[in-house]
Amino acid sequence: MDRNREARRVPMAAAGNGLSRRRHRAGSFRDSPEEEGPVELPEAARLRDRGGSNKKDRDRERDRDRERERERDRERDRLNSRSKRRRGERLMMVHGNLDDGGDDSSEESVNDDEEYDDGGVGPPSSLKMLPPTSNNISAASFSSSLSNHHNGGSGNLHHHHHSHNNNHQRKNNFPPTKVFRSSPSPAPVSPLVSTWKAADEMIGVSVPRKARSACTKRPHESWASSTTGGGVFASGEQIHRQISSTSPANRVSPASILASPSPPAPTSPSSSSISVRKKLPSGTKQKPLPPKSSSSKLSSPVAVQDEIEIEIAEVLYGMMRMPSTSKQEAAGNDLTEAAKSTVEVKSRVSSPISNPQTLPQSSITLAANSSSSNVSAIAPKRKKPRHVKYEDDNSSRVTTIKSEAEAPSKSQVPFSNQLKSSGSGEGNSSVLDSIIPLTRESNASLDSEKKENNLSKDETILPKVESSSGFRSDGEGAKSSSPEKEKFEIDLMAPPPVRSSSERGGEMMECVAAEAKPKVTEVETEAKPLLKEDRSDPAIHDSQEKKRPRMVAEAEHHKFERNCELKLDLDKSDHVGLVNKHHVQKPPPQQQLSVPDKTAQASHLPLHMSMPGWPGGLPTMGYMAPTQGVVPTDTSSLSAAAMQPPPHLLFNQPRPKRCATHCYIARNIQSHQQFTKMNPFWPAAAGSAPMYGTKACNLSLMPPTELQGSVLGRSSNPVQDKNSQSTSKSSETAQRNQLMLQQALPPGAANSILHGPTFIFPLGQQPHAAATIAAASVRPPNSGITSSGPTATSTSMNGSASATPAGAPTMSFSYPAMPGNETQYLAILQNNGYPFPVPAHVGAQPAYRGAPGQPMPFFNGSFYSSQMIQPPHHQPQKQHQQQLTGQMLQSHAPNNQNGSASTGSSAAQKHLQNQQLRPPINHGNSQGFPTHKVQSQPLNFQQRQQPRENATQHSETVGEDSPSTADSRGSRSNVAYGQNYGMQMQPTNLGLMSSPAPGGGVVGSSSSHGEKKSQQQVSKAGVESFQSPGYAMTFATFNGANTAPTLNMSSIAQNHAMFHSMPEAARQGYQMMAAQAAQQKMNYGASLEDGKSGSIGGAATANNTPEEQRKSGGGAIGKTSGGNGGQSIAFSNKQDLADASVSAVTSGSIVDSSSRLLNLGSALPQSSGSLPTSHHQQLLQQQQQQHMQRSQSQQPYTTMYLQKQQRYATSVAASAARTKGPVVSNGSGFPDHNMTTSPAGTTKFANANSGFPQNLVQSSSNQVQSQQWKNNSPRTTNTTQAQSPSMLSPSTSVAAASSLRNIPHKQQSRPQQSQISFAANSKPMTSGSPMQQVQGGTNHQAPSPPMLVGSPSTSSVSKNASGSPRTTASASSAANKGGQASTTTHSASQPSKNLQPASAASSAGGRNNGPSVLGNPTTSSGSKSQQQQQLPKHGLQPQAQLFFSNPYMQAQHQHQQQQITISPSGGYYIQRHQQQSGSAPAVPVTGAVTATSDPAKAIAAASAANNMKGGGGMGKTQQHQLGPPGFTNVHAVSSAVQVKPVDQKQQAGE
């Protein structure tokens, strides 16, 4: 379609002139210049082979596609007959324009129209129509093109192909066109046409072959870019592709740039455009253009057109040289092309409307390609000389046009994403209107409008405020401004020549603009319309740019070469680049664009900046003017470059090609990278306090810069930018615009933030918080610890730690109250991506905040949340929790970071996967406790965003781009925005982590505010409380309203991942805490066990339930469960991603998870309605499932499982819900509870909770999830999960979903399946036949995995893996039963500790069934709980455990005993953990896990964390090891085991 559109566009644009040119050009490129339509296909094939590097097969395919697309477009487009006519004749061209315009209308239509209008007074009417159509097509084409380009060369080729097809068609009609060109060859047209047609054929203005070739090729790139949906998105790939795939365009015509937007037409129209614009008064040309783009355009304005074509040829030639050079500087190679294209296009555009459209596209494409061009720097390179040559000729006009086009382009980059509608459409519309009446008038109007638009865009976008803004603002005066700016920029930018590539374009543009100023107002006007298009494209370009960071580097080098040629421009450009970078910081509008440009162009610049900045290169930072919290583009741009230099961990990852969120994430990542690079920081991270100092130093070092303006400046690093944003924002601007956040950050804050949450914009709403956040960010105690273990892992892998640290540090820094932690900044850290968790450490002084470290760890998503959450509660709770947890956590700091670490681990894994995952994962994970920072952020975002989770995804995500994305946005949004959406649930998470640093405690705390407080102290009672409130809190928190809940949530989330995950020990401790809380809550919840399920909605209820469960199951578990219930929500966040239920589950799970990471993970999803959850859980489960399914879409892999599972789970949940309602499988208890919560809170929270669980899940999933879910499934499911099954089901479902989400992202394979299976199965099982399942489970005990799969649950199970699904089903039953029994199971699980002996025995006995060693622990735990609850279940459990064990066994036998000791939660976790330990995945966890594992009990907490972390990792490993089968087995066993209990209980419940 894109190709078709492109072809159409080409036809329309090139209809008259473009066609001939294109065909000729194609002919030139191809062997036969004038292959007719029939030959066109082969030609196209050739074209593809050459230009698209597409093979003949592809060609054929494309031809077919082209045909299909054409037909589709035909059908799609209003101009069906026109399409035919277009094919049949010139009208086709018009149709192409119209069609293209139709699609592109949003983006290109306005611009095109405007340009067309500008192009000619007369032509605008007819032609105008074309442009709109063309634009529409372009819009559609743009998206598809972008997609295609993104997909690969195919899109671009497709466009080319379409163009060629259109060309064929046009060629069929071409004779007229050709004739027109030849016939009306008043010399200029003929030569130009000839040139366009065949570079050698005839060129009135002799165009050197090189120029021709370059024109054809490079312009083609632009054209392809443009054609491909405006080529903006296609830029990155397209440029690559374009270079390869340039042939078509190249063939099309040397003026392919012109033709580019409207493939063939643009060239001719471009020429015409120039002439026409000049000759605007003479409507001859213009009128000819409209009628039958080809015939009228060619016929009437044949002479003029020829003339124009000659002119265009000259301009193109010159532009290619000079503008290209300028543009190179401005936009890199692509920019050069864009400039060339813009200049000539603008000139051309001035005349023909068709050209304007085409040209604008071209221009945009070029602009976009500036990004892209980086990749295709080569082509631009060639162009450059020409440009240089031509500089004198067309310097003025081209320059002006280029400048204007470019500046607007840059300005518009951000908007361009919005389509050119905002600025472009706006300006273009007006301009168009103006233009239509009179070219001159139009020009003036256009200029002014453009000015306005540009200004608006600049202001809004932060593109090249300095560079573009000046002249752009001036509009007409822009010329003057431009020169001034040139000087200004030169001075400003003088320092970094490197920047020049980025700014080069801008500077060049300005320079050119200055030169061009005298030239022609018309040109300027034209340029402006083009600019608008350009502007629109830039955003896309940015994406492209991000896509091709490497290319960018090359391009930059090329640019440098070009710059050399354009010495003046280069200097200016450099200055401009610097200015832009610096200014970018200052002027948000300018910056954004600038930065994006830079991304493509400034690779090396950012490099240098980055490099130095990594610790110090913050120049980049400074350059990062865009800190803008948002300015993703900028971020992206810089980020990529900055990142690249230290590609540290992954970053290059921050491929600038992503959305703002992604950019931010990238930036954060970058920052983290820097930090990582600065490794001091890491050690510090481990070292915690030093972090601040050391890290801070390092971090700070650059962060101050970076964070502050610098970081912000580093906006170019999305990550950093974000970070800095966050920091600044938080700290200094927290309230101020978090966006700006940038400079003001307090040095400390900035530093801390710097890496930590990398974005950290804490969202903390209070500046304090921000500062706190920053501080915390810098040195999260947990972070530090976490950092040490996971940090390395996390650090390297994830930014998990980073985020965590951010959070922690926040805490540390927190004094402001911010529990600062919160700071949380979202902290985004996002770390997710960061390879290094900046974290955890970064602030890492566990001591600082004691508990706070954790929050940091959770860094990220929570951050916002937390932050959002007002630290008020947060803090106390958090601290309290942190104290509680802190001890545990701290002990687990690594673990905590396991939360973070685990998260980190997850994050690491995740992060690795995360970027892609991120959105999903972020969604899932992010939603939940951010598994990593990224997750966190997304988590936060997503949680907050939950609603937005999908979108965010997002996150960031984000980003993953990051995304997010979303992440960055959310993050960037900062408080409200990032936080908000993330906040929703995140706050809970935040709160969770924050408040219930321990996880449950806070959660409880949050959950019941009142309770929360008391329970908070309980340590985790809060957990429960926080479940509900958490959710609410989330929002409230975000708003600051419910800090507590948020806090709780946050805590939980954080805790959950961090705490829970983190410390198995903590978990144990947590459990203790939880136990405390649980007991405390138990009071509430004692009765709640099943009954409370109904209360799901209420945190208290949930809490109670969990409490009760806890009590029943064992205080810890119940409590955790309860707390988690509340927390669930928070966690659910993550899960919510997956499912609402997940939300609860997650939350609860997570919290509980702390106690039982497993539960966390397992319960997490399932636990949502822990108690209440049997039903509720199921309900939640359903929600969860829904969410999950939603999520699933997000995470395909997981999703699949998840979905399947979820479906089952849903059904189970539904049945359970129907039957039991909230009776959650208490086993999971809190998962159920979570579920419960989920429904009430989760539902809201679903996403949010999901987030957490995702985190958890992710954490869990990663660590726990896998282990939890894997284990959980098997083990937790078995044990906790047995009870959890229900929970698990939901939890698992959710968790699975989460896990899935996480896992798929992170370890998609292992936990995901297992989890999902498990979860899904649980539900189905529960739903379907708990008994059956039980039976199946029981029966299946041994074969459980398979059998279970076979079991009722099986459907789900089978899906998952044989065992898994069955297990799940079993688990589901069990879960339900467990849920009911869950309390017991859950309790048992958690209490497993309590029950542990029994559990162990049980495990030995029941679980022994399975490999005792392996199975035992898990089994024990689960078994015990379940056993206690229901021996039969236990029997089953053994199976489940067995299976579970198996994986565990495989992973780690040792744990099993320990695990047993650990208790379901602990045991499971531990097991999981150990597994993880055993497995690679546990990296972060590994240490903790290992230690924990062996010590198991002692380390239970750690183990928990480890488990969570390790579990996640391990789970992953397990899953991976076990693989779905193994996992499945495990799950199956779990399920089986659980099934029985579930059956019993569930039936009872149901």
Curated annotation (Swiss-Prot):
InterPro entries: TIC (IPR039317). Keywords: Biological rhythms, Nucleus. It is found in: Nucleus. Residues 43-80, 447-461, 473-490 have a biased composition (Basic and acidic residues). Regulator of normal clock function. Acts in the mid to late night. Contributes to the amplitude of circadian clocks. May act on the transcriptional induction of LATE ELONGATED HYPOCOTYL (LHY). Inhibits MYC2 protein accumulation, acting as a negative factor in the JA-signaling pathway. Called 'TIME FOR COFFEE' because it acts in the mid to late night, a phase at which any human activity often requires coffee. This is Protein TIME FOR COFFEE. It comes from Arabidopsis thaliana (Mouse-ear cress). The gene is TIC.
